[in-house]
Amino acid sequence: MSYTPGHYAGSRSSSGNRSGILKKTSWADQSERNYQTFNRGRKTQPKFTVSTQPQGNTIPHYSWFSGITQFQKGRDFKFSDGQGVPIAFGVPPSEAKGYWYRHSRRSFKTADGQQKQLLPRWYFYYLGTGPYANASYGESLEGVFWVANHQADTSTPSDVSSRDPTTQEAIPTRFPPGTILPQGYYVEGSGRSASNSRPGSRSQSRGPNNRSLSRSNSNFRHSDSIVKPDMADEIANLVLAKLGKDSKPQQVTKQNAKEIRHKILTKPRQKRTPNKHCNVQQCFGKRGPSQNFGNAEMLKLGTNDPQFPILAELAPTPGAFFFGSKLDLVKRDSEADSPVKDVFELHYSGSIRFDSTLPGFETIMKVLEENLNAYVNSNQNTDSDSLSSKPQRKRGVKQLPEQFDSLNLSAGTQHISNDFTPEDHSLLATLDDPYVEDSVA
């Protein structure tokens, strides 16, 4: 006995178009029946048959299911093992075997007069039917992809009858849960009218005007299921536009950078995270003996520096900070602008231990050597450049040698005064004290 998709064995189903098919939809490339219904007032168009359809759009064999259309170039049509056979009520799992056949579609002329080829569409045929009815399962054929259920015996043809397009309409392609559809493809008719037709089907059949409603709905479904020539390109452009939109980096304006900086600086000092919008000096001040880490590049980028993540691996956890450090609570004098506040500082000292077996050890050592006390070398280089650089002469003005010396000295003194920390100033004050010779007892 031959199985018919959409028929239950032994069920009482009426003849004709109401023969138990799950859902009936007209597909433009397969059936043109009842064309006069929605062509009133127009000249009747000839009905294409298998022998009279134009070349390039001929489908000599009619599939039981709607097609799968490609909308992205360069994508392979494939299913995982055990997947790819559409759901068909009335066909047992043992007969769920067959192949997908690539149908080359016609070309069309664009607005600028160029010929453009539509991307192919694939149709499913049961094993032993369709254009390769005599082929064995798994045979290497151009434009054929074999699929089968794990329970199907692929050594014998499937016992499924061929579809008669005059009395049997195509079934919308549906797959079992978990099936992965090939990327760059979409199922014809999926998600178009299913959500709109189910809720109102019962109420429409009971109403007095169900015949006119069904006719209008049929007209709507027909026009909605026709694939326009440029539909594949429209979908591809939408996908590419979506990808391009998501891949564009977010631009930060001056106003946004100012807001980010203000948000960081309003946090307590120990909660600030310096970045390229609010650098290290803005968050924690200039480098000196008490804050001696960071070269020029890292001070500028903060945590956005490419080398910072590997240093973050060395940072202690909150538990290690509190339980592995020496802590001292010190009360500070109230600030002048807020004398009513009690200010405390939690002083801490500890160590971070690591050895040469740590992943990325050599890189960590290199980064540490480049950033520890980097401010010392930076100050020395800047001072030497300031003292050795010659001031620009004003055009038409002759400067005396004494003026050059005073300019160099003032520039160097000003730079040193700006870069020294309070600890450095106290050290300079000590050096300015008069020299006292040690007495010999």
UniProtKB/Swiss-Prot annotation:
Its main location: virion. Residues 264-382 are annotated as: Dimerization. SUPFAM superfamilies: Coronavirus RNA-binding domain, Nucleocapsid protein dimerization domain. GO terms for cellular component: host cell endoplasmic reticulum-Golgi intermediate compartment; host cell Golgi apparatus; ribonucleoprotein complex; viral nucleocapsid. The modification Phosphoserine is found at S158, S190, S388, S417. Residues 257-379 form the CoV N CTD domain. It is found in: Virion; Host endoplasmic reticulum-Golgi intermediate compartment; Host Golgi apparatus. Residues 10-20, 189-220 have a biased composition (Low complexity). Packages the positive strand viral genome RNA into a helical ribonucleocapsid (RNP) and plays a fundamental role during virion assembly through its interactions with the viral genome and membrane protein M. Plays an important role in enhancing the efficiency of subgenomic viral RNA transcription as well as viral replication. Homooligomer. Both monomeric and oligomeric forms interact with RNA. Interacts with protein M. Interacts with NSP3; this interaction serves to tether the genome to the newly translated replicase-transcriptase complex at a very early stage of infection. This is Nucleoprotein.
